[in-house]
Every structure is written in C-alpha cells, then in structure tokens.
Amino acid sequence: MQDNQKVKKKEQYNLNKLQKRLRRNVGEAIADFNMIEEGDRIMVCLSGGKDSYTMLEILRNLQQSAPINFSLVAVNLDQKQPGFPEHILPAYLEQLGVEYKIVEENTYGIVKEKIPEGKTTCSLCSRLRRGILYRTATELGATKIALGHHRDDILQTLFLNMFYGGKMKGMPPKLMSDDGKHIVIRPLAYCREKDIVRFAEAKAFPIIPCNLCGSQPNLQRQVIADMLRDWDKRYPGRIETMFSAMQDIVPSHLCDTNLFDFKGIAHGSEVVDGGDLAFDREEIPLQPAGWQPEEDDTPLETLRLDVIEVK
C-alpha cells in the first residue's frame, strides 16, 4: 500500500514539474511577443490533438494567475470527415466549463472532389480551414486566434524551407493575417514536443486521430522530423541551440542584400555587428548555446516527493 502511494506521489510530482515547465515556456512566449493583452478574447483552435489540448489546458491555468484579464473560447472545425467522433470535444469542454463553438463545414467533401485520389490534401484543406476560422473569429469577436504549433513545428518548418524552398523562413510565433484583420498567436512556440506528449499522456486527454481524412502524410516533413529527433538523441543540446539561433540573427553575416547593405560598405563605414571574421575562425563554445541538462535527468534520490500541487 505504501509503495503504491509513493509511486502515485512521484507521478504527481513529475506531472506538476512538467506542467510548471510548460507554463513557464508559454508564459515566456506570451511576454516576449506580447501575445495576450488586457481584455483579449482568445479563440483557441482545438483539433482534438495533443498540442491543442495542452495549449487550452495551459492557457486556462495561466488565466487564473495572470496579471491581466482575458477570456478564452474554444473552437473546433468539424470538417465532416468519415468516422469523426463528434461527441468527444463537446463532452470534454462541457465538463471543463469552457465556452466553445463547434463549426460544421463539409470541407472534406470539397477536398475529395478537387484533389485526385492518393495525392496530399493538406494544402487545400489548410486554406479552407484558415478561411473558416478567420470568419468564425470575427463572428465571435475574438481579438486573437491561438494555434497549437510548438518549438519542433517551428524548427521543422525552418528546415523544410531551407531544404526544399530555398528560404530562411520558419513559423512566426505571432503574425497578422493577410487581410490585416486577425492576429494569430502560437503560445506553445517555446514548448518541446516531447514535453507535450508526456503531458497529454499524463492528463489522459481524449485524443482524436488526425488521419481520418485518409490523406497521405507529408513525407518531406516526416523526413525533417525524423532528422531532428535523431539529432536530439545523438547530440544533446543541438535542438536548443538551433532554436536559439532563430532568435539571434546577424544579417551582416548572411547573404541577403535586402537585409543588409553590403554594397554600401566602404572605407570609413561603421563596424558591423557580428565581428570581423575575414581571417580568423570563430571560436565555438564547447557546450551548445542555450542548452542545459534536462530536469528529468535529476537522480531520483534527489527528488522531493512532497510537492503535489502546482503553486
């Protein structure tokens, strides 16, 4: 009996520690990019996957202690995919007492009509979904639209654009829609996918499969995802360093003439940021920038097991 209590206490401690880390990550992202302001009405896009469930849970948690007032409304788009369990999200949200709206639009039928069998449908589906969500945000009076993309998604997009698109372009934590009417935020921008996976499992969210449409997976993105996972295992700290690099750009040491006036460099010009690397090799730190050993690596005997609530 005592052993079972110790196990449960340890599991609760680990869950609280994980939730604190996710809260901290989300809080830092919100502060760094001014994602949420006083009086905001946040439309939380809920797909039924681990990421959007986690986003809603952490935002609800932060809402209770935030120094500003903001409201949340969860929105799910029922695209009429065969086998979609329509009852799951309403039951879950009603249990939480969260305001929500289920938008029913047969985008599945449109996509199946327009895209040949066996081809990836994600691009058209995404465009249709985006338009519907923007319209819904207007109807609900939402000032911000929250999406559940995390740090790994942002890095994957960076490498996809580098490898296949020839661009240094990632996925912004905050953006304005093309029509200038909607601000989109990604509160999980600093969160690791593996933390989200563990959190979703511990919370036992009622996950809805993402392959109901029968679309072929994005093989290019899968290749990039596998590459990053391999690097994370073989080279601890590399993922953290790459993400830090996205936040510390030195235009004078790249090759984009739109970002830096290389032609304007002449005798008497100011010294550019980044240092003079014309002759000397730059010294690289032995430990990856922005990386610290994971908290989960703490030896079990040093863990306090008396913390059972997130303060």
Swiss-Prot record:
What general EC class does the enzyme of this chain belong to? transferase
Catalytic reaction equation(s) = cytidine(32) in tRNA + S-sulfanyl-L-cysteinyl-[cysteine desulfurase] + AH2 + ATP = 2-thiocytidine(32) in tRNA + L-cysteinyl-[cysteine desulfurase] + A + AMP + diphosphate + H(+)
Q: Which Pfam families does the record match to this protein?
A: ATP_bind_3
Q: Where does [4Fe-4S] cluster bind?
A: 122, 125, 213
Which GO biological process categories is it annotated with? tRNA thio-modification
Q: What does the record give as its pathway?
A: tRNA modification
Single annotated GO MF: magnesium ion binding
Q: Which InterPro entries match?
A: Rossmann-like_a/b/a_fold (IPR014729), TilS/TtcA_N (IPR011063), tRNA_Cyd_32_2_STrfase (IPR012089), tRNA_thiolation_TtcA_Ctu1 (IPR035107)
Report further notes: The thiolation reaction likely consists of two steps: a first activation step by ATP to form an adenylated intermediate of the target base of tRNA, and a second nucleophilic substitution step of the sulfur (S) atom supplied by the hydrosulfide attached to the Fe-S cluster.
- Role summary: Catalyzes the ATP-dependent 2-thiolation of cytidine in position 32 of tRNA, to form 2-thiocytidine (s(2)C32). The sulfur atoms are provided by the cysteine/cysteine desulfurase (IscS) system.
Family classification: Belongs to the TtcA family.
- What is the designated name of this protein? tRNA-cytidine(32) 2-sulfurtransferase
> What is the protein's species of origin?
Salmonella arizonae (strain ATCC BAA-731 / CDC346-86 / RSK2980)
